């Protein structure tokens, strides 16, 4: 059953516990330690309840959308986040450690909109405590439809000496 509570993002649902060694219990023999028999080992993830599913929802008011593009930028969402806007699947990200973004413009309408994110941490998917939930900031970025894409902009040094440098700049509009 779901238990809804009001939280602020960033948020990690596992931090509040309850702590229990079952969350990271292994029965193994550590060969490097010379162990011949398997025994219980725990503690690699701090006994935090990071395995499971979590859901986040919020509302977003949008004014005149003409000429605008709306992007959600996630700095960290553990794990396997699926993003919904007004009940429509807007996107999925298969990894929890790297940032990602989604263009949600096609799913929005002027007025009140509902954003939802579901996350799922699988058993045995981490060797350490990975986090659980929207553990880093989430940003709504509004830009003109015609604009420089900050995630597709690259600057590199082609040549440099003590007197001058030549730089190359690549971007997408």
Regions found by a protein language model. Name each.
Residues 2, 7, 61, 169-170:
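Beta-propeller folds
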